[in-house]
Amino acid sequence: MKALVTGASGGIGQDMARMLSAMGYDLIAVARSRDKLEALKQELNTEVQVLPLDLSREQACFDLYNQVKDQNIDVLINNAGYGMYGRFYDTDLEQELNMLRLNIQAVHILTKLFLRDFKKRNKGYLMNVSSSAAFFAGPLMSSYYASKAYVFRLTEAVYEELRREKSDVSVSVLCPGPVDTLSLIHISEP
């Protein structure tokens, strides 16, 4: 059994990797920090392939898929993401667009590519990590909240498509509340 976890270097992704390893899954751990991924690898008792990639770069998403597509991934945890804090009109536009590329575009690309493989095999499990932020307006974190709403709605729609087809492929979305991680970038204080 093999699972791919994005954002595996810390927080929810790291905990998901630990949990999946404890369940006997070999892992493909993806994040920007090779050092943190290597530390995770040393901690786990199953095989761990470390792939340091910046998934906010569109090509990195395709590179990731092409590197692992022949490994018969059973589980994809789309977890990589971060938030920005500040008034919408004050936050740095390029940093915000980078966040949106990671929180939305990477999730979209990886969901589509791996879901196609899961459908061909009629098995697989995909979890997209959203947030309870998906259900609220989110002043001072407007773009982050909107990005998590996208992840929630996309996953909900894909779930419904698969349910109607009576597919054996499973899709779910995790919407945790606030979590003590380093994924919040303080850009500008109100």
Q: Language-model features: where?
A:
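Conserved glycine-rich cofactor-binding loop
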Residues: 9-10
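Substrate-binding pocket helix/loop in short-chain dehydrogenase/reductase
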Residues: 87-89, 95-100
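Residue(s) in the substrate-gating loop at a strand-loop-helix junction
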Residues: 131
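The beta1-alpha1 cofactor-binding region of Rossmann-like NAD(H)/NADP(H)-dependent oxidoreductases
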Residues: 52-63, 93
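Conserved glycine-rich Rossmann-like NAD(P)H-binding loop of the short-chain dehydrogenase/reductase
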Residues: 23-39
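Residue-level detector of conserved catalytic or cofactor/ligand-binding positions
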Residues: 185-190
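Active-site helix of classical SDR
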Residues: 111, 147
